[in-house]
């Protein structure tokens, strides 16, 4: 064979190999039972946690190509439970989640970063009370038949108008709220 033919053929083969690698096949997952989404903060120095009763998660992810990953979470704010009825009613009210007007929040991220091992970060956007702000989620990916995504983020509540009015005082309720999740996933068939 002539070297004139081999050079274009090798170039084409290299391009096909590069394109095949760039178009990685991320697996698609949806949330399975057993998933949790909780937050922790304090009021007058007393720490408390709350659990979001309903949230739905969709993930597209290939650990070999985290830059192609996507995450979509829809969080139902009605029914948030802290174990204290008065506090739960206050959180549902206009000064906090304002569930009458904003019944849900969303978090979306496109393109994850590897932090080494099974650790990743997702620079995403949280929309809460009609306000969208960047929020970084760091997470551990545990592969398997039902992989898990266990993550943590810090949300600045005042950036979203959560805890307005008399509740703006950060000596009573800190601005930073810790959010953690463990999402059990199942593959989309």
Ranges and model annotations:
Residues 9-20:
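Bacterial N-terminal signal peptides
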Residues 24-189:
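Low-complexity, acidic/polar, glycine-enriched regions of mature
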Residues 2-3, 21-25:
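N-terminal targeting/secretion presequences
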Residues 1-11:
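Bacterial N-terminal signal peptides that target proteins for export
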């Amino acid at each position: 064979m002539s070297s004139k033919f081999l050079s274009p053929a090798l170039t084409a083969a290299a391009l096909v190999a590069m394109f095949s690698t760039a178009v990685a096949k991320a697996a698609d997952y949806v949330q399975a039972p057993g998933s949790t989404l909780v937050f922790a903060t304090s009021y007058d120095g007393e720490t408390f946690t709350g659990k979001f009763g309903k949230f739905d998660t969709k993930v597209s992810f290939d650990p070999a190509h985290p830059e192609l990953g996507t995450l979509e979470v829809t969080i139902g704010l009605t029914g948030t439970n802290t174990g204290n009825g008065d506090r739960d009613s206050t959180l549902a009210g206009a000064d906090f989640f304002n569930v009458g007007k904003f019944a849900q929040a969303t978090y979306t991220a496109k393109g994850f970063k590897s932090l080494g091992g099974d650790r990743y970060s997702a620079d995403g956007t949280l929309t809460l009370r009609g306000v969208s702000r960047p929020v970084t989620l760091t997470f551990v990916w545990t592969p398997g038949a039902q992989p898990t995504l266990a993550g943590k983020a810090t949300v600045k509540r005042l950036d979203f108008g959560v805890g307005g009015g008399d509740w703006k005082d950060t000596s009573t309720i800190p601005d930073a709220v810790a959010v953690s999740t463990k999402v059990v996933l199942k593959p989309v068939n």
